[in-house]
């Protein structure tokens, strides 16, 4: 496929075909962005009627950690590009698919392998690139875990090497927390990996996501790195509940953040948007994690930027020019399911959209859980503080209710 100049017509022999592996709320927005450019999109997920399935040209339900099933769906659909949107994927199969010339993996198969778990990316960042991180240790048994906690010291953070949205993540503050933290991590991993990272506690002031885009510069036709304004966010139990843009920070801290983001994304290579998570205290910055795809905290860019993180990702992977310019201060606030039920309804939508500058994204997930992210309220404002207040007010107005 000729990247960057030619796009075909969906559902025709000329179609530019993209397959998303993972069709949640972030994948759904990427699909919409791709379809606006006339791309034929195939969405794959582990459960039926996922948000992205509802808007894709075609949908498949498979276990994406099953290498044979993954290879079969790729051979059946013959996409030009494969875009992983989650971590729980048979990445060795992706490497084989790319090596066989069946499709190009975004950003690269190697990047997907490195970032599929926290061990690969932490070793790249700290040991190969020499970036500042929290002290850390890995463990694959309870005895090794106990020794790691003793080595790192308390308090410390425990995470499965493969999980997302805070699943399996906890803080060990006393000896009484050690066994429950191990059990919780084992239950919360995306796949039955049985391995955790123990991280020392960093006394940071705030966290940011530095959205970083590797895209083709139309002036040189070479890959160039672009930065969005920093996204601030609040996490509870490892799961984002609120984000805003721009996050105020010192010029030196911003420079360091972008230097770290540039180094790690350059090492991963390829094209696309990356979410680089960082801890900041004063002028000091520590690397935390990176995702080679749009980031949940970046949902705020649907309101804040001329091109959202999803549009930036779509353009970058297609070899098209990008523009990460900030349009307005904005914020997002999560709307939780509140109850465990399929096919819930939402009340208070009119009230939410009556908040000045507010908008909603209801994701359309077929099943709700009390703490499952079912939507997000967005708002712009003259300042970040005003946008945050509006987003939280709009989110609070939405009431998930039983449809029974």
Curated annotation (Swiss-Prot):
HAMAP family registered for this protein in UniProt: PurT (MF_01643)
The keyword Nucleotide-binding is assigned to this record: yes
Name assigned to this protein: Formate-dependent phosphoribosylglycinamide formyltransferase
Function: Involved in the de novo purine biosynthesis. Catalyzes the transfer of formate to 5-phospho-ribosyl-glycinamide (GAR), producing 5-phospho-ribosyl-N-formylglycinamide (FGAR). Formate is provided by PurU via hydrolysis of 10-formyl-tetrahydrofolate.
Residue numbers binding Mg(2+): 277, 289
Pathway: Purine metabolism; IMP biosynthesis via de novo pathway; N(2)-formyl-N(1)-(5-phospho-D-ribosyl)glycinamide from N(1)-(5-phospho-D-ribosyl)glycinamide (formate route): step 1/1
Gene3D superfamilies tied to this protein: 3.40.50.20, ATP-grasp fold, A domain, ATP-grasp fold, B domain
InterPro entries: ATP-grasp (IPR011761), ATP-grasp_carboxylate-amine (IPR003135), ATP_grasp_subdomain_1 (IPR013815), PreATP-grasp_dom_sf (IPR016185), PurT (IPR005862), PurT/PurK_preATP-grasp (IPR054350), PurT_C (IPR048740), Rudment_hybrid_motif (IPR011054)
The ATP-grasp domain, residue ranges: 123-318
Species the sequence originates in: Burkholderia ambifaria (strain ATCC BAA-244 / DSM 16087 / CCUG 44356 / LMG 19182 / AMMD) (Burkholderia cepacia (strain AMMD))
Binding sites annotated in the UniProt record for ATP: 118, 159, 164-169, 199-202, 207
Catalytic activity: N(1)-(5-phospho-beta-D-ribosyl)glycinamide + formate + ATP = N(2)-formyl-N(1)-(5-phospho-beta-D-ribosyl)glycinamide + ADP + phosphate + H(+)
Positions of N(1)-(5-phospho-beta-D-ribosyl)glycinamide binding: 25-26, 85, 296, 365, 372-373
EC annotation from Swiss-Prot or TrEMBL: 6.3.1.21
Protein family (similarity comment): Belongs to the PurK/PurT family.
EC primary class: ligase
Single GO cellular component term: cytosol
């Amino acid at each position: 496929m000729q990247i960057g100049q030619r796009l075909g017509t969906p559902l025709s022999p000329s179609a530019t075909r993209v397959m998303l592996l993972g069709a949640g709320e972030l994948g759904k927005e990427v699909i919409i962005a791709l379809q606006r450019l006339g791309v034929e999109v195939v969405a794959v997920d582990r459960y039926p009627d996922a948000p992205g399935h509802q808007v894709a040209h075609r949908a498949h339900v498979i276990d994406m950690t099953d290498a044979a099933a993954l290879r079969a769906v790729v051979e059946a659909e013959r996409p030009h590009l494969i875009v992983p949107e989650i971590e729980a994927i048979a990445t060795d199969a992706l490497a084989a698919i790319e090596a066989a010339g069946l499709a190009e993996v975004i950003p690269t198969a190697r990047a997907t392998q490195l970032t599929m778990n926290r061990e690969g990316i932490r070793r790249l960042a700290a040991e190969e690139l020499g970036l500042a991180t929290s002290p850390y240790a890995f463990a694959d048994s309870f005895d090794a875990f106990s020794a790691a906690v003793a080595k790192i010291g308390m308090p410390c953070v425990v995470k499965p090497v493969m999980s997302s949205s805070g699943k399996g993540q906890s803080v060990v503050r006393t000896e009484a927390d050690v066994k429950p933290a191990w059990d919780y991590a084992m239950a919360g991993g995306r796949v039955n990996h049985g391995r955790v990272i123990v991280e020392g506690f960093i006394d940071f002031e705030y966290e940011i996501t530095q959205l970083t885009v590797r895209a083709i510069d139309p002036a040189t036709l070479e890959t160039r790195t672009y930065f969005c304004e920093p996204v601030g966010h609040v996490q509870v139990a490892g799961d984002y509940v609120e984000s805003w843009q721009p996050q105020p920070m010192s010029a030196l801290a911003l420079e360091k953040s972008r230097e770290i983001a540039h180094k790690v994304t350059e090492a991963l290579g390829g094209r696309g948007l990356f979410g680089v998570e960082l801890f900041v205290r004063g002028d000091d910055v520590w690397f935390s994690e990176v995702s080679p795809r749009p980031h949940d905290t970046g949902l705020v860019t649907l309101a804040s930027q001329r091109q959202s993180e999803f549009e930036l990702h779509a353009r970058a992977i297609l070899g098209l020019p990008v523009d990460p310019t900030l349009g307005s201060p904005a914020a997002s606030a999560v709307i939780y399911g509140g109850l465990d039920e399929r096919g819930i309804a939402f009340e208070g939508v009119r009230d939410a959209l009556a908040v000045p500058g507010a908008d909603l994204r209801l994701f359309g997930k077929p099943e709700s859980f009390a703490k499952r992210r079912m939507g997000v309220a967005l708002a712009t404002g003259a300042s970040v503080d005003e946008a945050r207040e509006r987003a939280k007010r709009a989110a609070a107005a939405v009431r998930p209710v039983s449809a029974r």
